[in-house]
Amino acid sequence: MSARHKDPRLTARPRQPNETAPRGAVSLGSDKVRGGILYVPEQYHPTAPAPLIVALHGGGGQARSWERLYEPCEEHGIVLLAPESRGRTWDAIQGMFGPDVVFLDSALEYVFARCAINPKKIALAGFSDGASYALSLGPSNGDLFSELIAFSPGFSYPEEPIIGRPKVFISHGTEDRVLPVSLSRDGIAPMFDMDGYTIRYEEFTGGHEMPPEVVTKALDWFLGSEP
C-alpha cells in the first residue's frame, strides 16, 4: 500500500465489456466488508455507451445514501457507481491518497468490465466529505472525469500531477452549520475559477443537504455539458 501513498492517479479506463452487465442495484461488498453499489438502468444496452456518475458519500456515510439517484439514473440511462470509503472518511482528509484510491480503481475496473461507458461523460460527484474528496482527487484525473460535482464541500486538496480541466459544479446551502457556505463561496469556487476551470456555482436557501431541485440542476448540467 505504501507505493500508492499520496498517489491520486486512477488507472481504470472504459473499454469493451467482456462480462454481462447486471440491471438494477448490485452490492459490491458484504455485510462485513464495506464495498458499494452499482446501479445499471433497465434501458442500458451495450451498443450505446452510457454516462457514468461515481458518487461519494459523506463522512460516516454509506453507498445507499445515493439511492435517491436511482430514479433519475433510470430516466436518463445513467450508470451509477457508489463506492464506500475504507474508513469512516475518505483518505484525503487524512493527508494521503491511498486505500480509497486503490479501492475506487478496482470498483471502476468492475464497472468497465461489465458496462459500456461513454468516455466523454464520466462524472465524479460527492456530498460533504465525499464532495471534498471529489474536488481533491478529480483534478489529478481530468483525463478520466469530464465533470466534477460537489454538493456542500469543505475543502479541495489536490496533489500533483494535475491533468486536464474537468468542468466543475459546486452547490452549497447558505444556512449550512456543518460546513459554512463561505468555504465554497470565498475559497473553493474562486480557486477553481482562477485555475482556469469552467465552473458553475449554485447557492440555495438551506443547510447541509442536497435538495432535490439542486440535484436535478446538477444532473441536467452534467447531461447537457458539452464534451
Model-derived features with residue positions:
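Serine-hydrolase catalytic machinery in alpha/beta-hydrolase-like enzymes
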Residues: R13-Q43, T47-A116
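A domain-start/cap signature at the N-terminus of enzymes
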Residues: M1-P51, M96-P99, A125-S132, L137, ...
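Short beta-strand/loop motif that positions the catalytic acidic residue
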Residues: F169-H172, D176
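Short alpha-helix in the alpha/beta-hydrolase fold that links the catalytic acid
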Residues: R68, P180-P190
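Primarily recognizes the serine-hydrolase "nucleophile elbow" in alpha/beta-hydrolase
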Residues: F112-R114, K120-R165
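Short, proline-enriched alpha-helix->beta-strand connector loops that line the catalytic pocket
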Residues: I163-V168, D195-Y197
